[in-house]
A protein has these predicted regions:
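Membrane-interfacial terminal anchoring regions of lipid-handling membrane enzymes
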Residues: 1-170
Length: 170
């Protein structure tokens, strides 16, 4: 669901290929939160899930403009409850990281507490979908992902651009 919405928003020309690219990107983003099967099994699992909601989808050609109306006809949406809090938390952490000077040392614990405070404020302002997004564990996962991508250690001006790209993902 999340991959398809993003593909629709980007108005991709090759919807199927763009969907798979987005699914792989989401898998990479959430790799510290979920245990995913090997790539071949993962692709088969995703294809089976899509087939439940939209039988025969692999044999059709889609236009990005058709995605949202097609999704609107689905009987059950689960992504917002399943991975929504993860993406909200990661988005907050990525935004906070992008605001930091690239040469600044960042204390991980203080950063996580800052993210929790911002998340609580956004919840009170009704800017978050779920209070589950206010989670030390989820912010720790976001820090781990940012660290894995080399975005948490001090660096030069190029680091600021990489951090902003990371924030833009969410």
């Amino acid at each position: 669901e999340v991959a398809l919405v993003r593909v629709a928003q980007e108005e991709a020309e090759d919807v199927t290929n763009a969907m798979w690219e987005e699914v792989v990107r989401l898998r990479d983003v959430l790799k510290y939160e979920f245990f995913f099967p090997r790539t071949t099994h993962f692709a088969a699992d995703v294809a089976n899930e899509v087939d439940i909601a939209y039988p025969g989808w692999e044999s059709e050609t889609f236009d990005a403009k058709e995605i949202l109306p097609t999704l609107a006809k689905a009987k059950l949406f689960v992504a917002h409850r399943t991975i929504g809090p993860f993406l909200e938390s990661y988005g907050i952490a990525a935004d906070r990281l992008a605001l930091r000077a690239p040469d600044e040392e960042i204390d991980r614990e203080e950063f996580i507490l800052e993210c929790i405070g911002v998340a609580q404020q956004r919840w009170y302002q009704k800017e978050l979908y779920s209070p589950e997004s206010i989670s030390r564990d989820l912010f720790s996962g976001a820090v781990q992902l940012a660290s894995n991508r080399g975005l948490f250690e001090p660096g030069g001006p190029e680091l600021a651009a990489k951090r902003q790209d990371f924030a833009d993902e969410f």
